């Protein structure tokens, strides 16, 4: 059975009005987030913004940061740095796995050579 778009956190399903109502924010605030490239939802064929659940969660985070007094440019930079940090953590995990394989290969070859 195939999954439905509603099951996909990245499916762009919600309009600006729906998201504004869900989060108790103004539609203009959501448009400003897009204009400042903080949260840029996909567009429908008619050009309307459509938000995924993942983007709605991100907007909630942005609302919290703005409530704490952060500017949109500061928030955009925070989001960029968090993305870079996640990528660095993934790369570290890859390198640690590679190091583990290399150590295992080295130990196996030492065992073979001592026989």
Summary of predicted features, one role per range:
Residues 40-46:
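Beta-hairpin "wing" of winged helix-turn-helix
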Residues 19-20, 75:
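Short alpha-helical "recognition helix" segments of helix-turn-helix
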Residues 26-29:
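Short coil turns linking two alpha-helices in DNA-binding domains
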Residues 2-12, 35, 40, 53-115:
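Arg/Lys-rich, alpha-helical DNA-contact motif
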Residues 47-53:
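Minor-groove-contacting beta-hairpin "wing" of winged helix-turn-helix DNA-binding domains
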Residues 20, 33, 51:
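Append "Primarily bacterial transcriptional regulators
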């Amino acid at each position: 059975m195939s999954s439905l778009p509603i099951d996909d956190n990245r499916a762009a399903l919600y309009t600006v009005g729906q998201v504004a109502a869900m989060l108790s924010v103004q539609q203009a605030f959501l448009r400003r987030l897009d204009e400042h490239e903080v949260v840029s939802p996909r567009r429908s064929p008619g050009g309307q913004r459509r938000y995924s659940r993942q983007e709605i969660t991100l907007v909630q985070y942005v609302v919290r940061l703005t409530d704490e007094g952060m500017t949109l440019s500061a928030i955009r930079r925070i989001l960029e740095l968090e993305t870079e940090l996640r990528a660095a953590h993934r790369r570290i995990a890859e390198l640690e796995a590679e190091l583990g394989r290399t150590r295992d290969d080295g130990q196996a070859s030492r065992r073979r050579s001592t026989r």
